[in-house]
Amino acid sequence: MAVPKRRMSRANTRSRRAQWKAEKTELVGVTVAGQRHKVPRRLLKAARLDLIDLDRR
């Protein structure tokens, strides 16, 4: 693992952290029990197997 050679200032640390931005998850259409829903891609299998409640939104 990389170890910093010198201490980084608080301002530099915070400005570096500010570069990271969360991305919006893309929703994919899925048909469950004749109804069309939009879910994140990682939840497609769970939605098809009826493991998650899609009507709670």
From Swiss-Prot:
UniProt GO cellular component terms: large ribosomal subunit
Region entry Disordered, spans: 1-20
Taxonomy, superkingdom: Bacteria
Family: Belongs to the bacterial ribosomal protein bL32 family.
Residue ranges with Basic residues bias: 1-19
Membrane-traversing stretches: none
GO molecular function: structural constituent of ribosome
Gene label: rpmF
Cysteines engaged in disulfide bonds, as pairs: none
Biological process, per Gene Ontology: translation
Keywords associated with the record: Ribonucleoprotein, Ribosomal protein
Protein name in UniProt: Large ribosomal subunit protein bL32
